[in-house]
Amino acid sequence: MKAKHWYDYLWVYAIIYFALGFSNILFAWLGMIDFLLPLFLAIFGGNKFFCNHLCGRGQLFSKLGTDLKCSRCKPTPRWMSSKWFRYGFLIFFLTMFGNMVFQTYLVAAGATSLREAIKLFWTFRVPWGWTYTAGTVTDWVAQFSFGFYSLMLTSLLLGLIVMVLYMPRTWCAFCPMGTMTQGICKLKNKE
């Protein structure tokens, strides 16, 4: 049996992150760890250590799909791991992230007001006001939280859907962070 490490339990972090965001939207900022740490490790380590060992979301999909048998364990369609789909999804994802940052800027500039809602699948507006008390922080900080949590929750739901339909970690085949870190590693290894 393989020895367990502390990082084998980071799937708990994924659950805690989403639970905290459900109770207080400002905890959404913790998700920046999942954005910055993989890039930092790829740039300075030249590998995908985060994806292979530290990704709580990937571990959660493994737990649910394999250990709890929530996955059909069907082969992942090849197009989901194809270069055109992965980079296309990355571009789409970064566009949505850029739009979220722009909306945050508009709130900070006073051009629009705070929207106390999250958007699932970048389309469906879900009231989420109970998670924030107006005036706790400046409006732009709260706006970023709502937008970022929307992005994180949508990607979790997409990951759960493909986990149920295919292999437990199908999300990892086209995860935007995985695609970016893979690109960074390829560039670093050419040096």
Region locations from a protein language model:
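Non-ligating segments of multi-cofactor redox enzymes
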Residues: 1-191
